[in-house]
């Protein structure tokens, strides 16, 4: 049985003054589905995210959201003042629905689920560490965990593997795939990498003001050339081959615009 969409965007257009940044964008996000939105810098990805999150209204077009939709958002990165005494555990607790909760308060209804998230993302050994001292890959797992704390129906990940090496990307993609399978949430993942995407992605959307193309990723981790360059153990990584429409799409693959 087909479930109702979590978010449906129809014919979205947006401009800042005389500059058009989104042109006739339509997309649908469902539960149990991973959609990867790719495009160069300046393609309109951040603006589209803000519209989907209801932070800004489009110049024209319509966005329909499931009633009471719970959204978890993972930002690209955060900056925490080095002088702030903030542990990983306390950082996660600040994301709870009720500020009186703690991760290990046995009286809360969410305790089991919180423990599951921490265990799933292998954060137990990091809970007492200062948040400022964790590595880039560890921080991404922490941000992902915090986005999951309110049991979202839709998880939006903004550049989740930015600044993470290929091994770290593979591990994070593995966690994201497990989250989709375990919790059944829809996932929208945003990336400026125009070729390398998560293998478990159900659909890739290529944005450059308009949707240039869409399709499925092709696995490349088993190819001899890929293994020679990166080694083995990167089964979560895949390649997306672009098939652009007849409208102008000016980005150069393999490079990002300034």
From Swiss-Prot:
The complex is composed of two ATP-binding proteins (ZnuC), two transmembrane proteins (ZnuB) and a solute-binding protein (ZnuA). It comes from Hydrogenovibrio crunogenus (strain DSM 25203 / XCL-2). The lineage of its organism: Bacteria, Pseudomonadati, Pseudomonadota, Gammaproteobacteria, Thiotrichales. The gene is znuC. It is a peripheral membrane protein. SMART domains: AAA. It catalyses: Zn(2+)(out) + ATP(in) + H2O(in) = Zn(2+)(in) + ADP(in) + phosphate(in) + H(+)(in). Part of the ABC transporter complex ZnuABC involved in zinc import. Responsible for energy coupling to the transport system. This is Zinc import ATP-binding protein ZnuC. Keywords: ATP-binding, Cell inner membrane, Cell membrane, Ion transport, Membrane, Nucleotide-binding, Translocase, Transport, Zinc, Zinc transport.
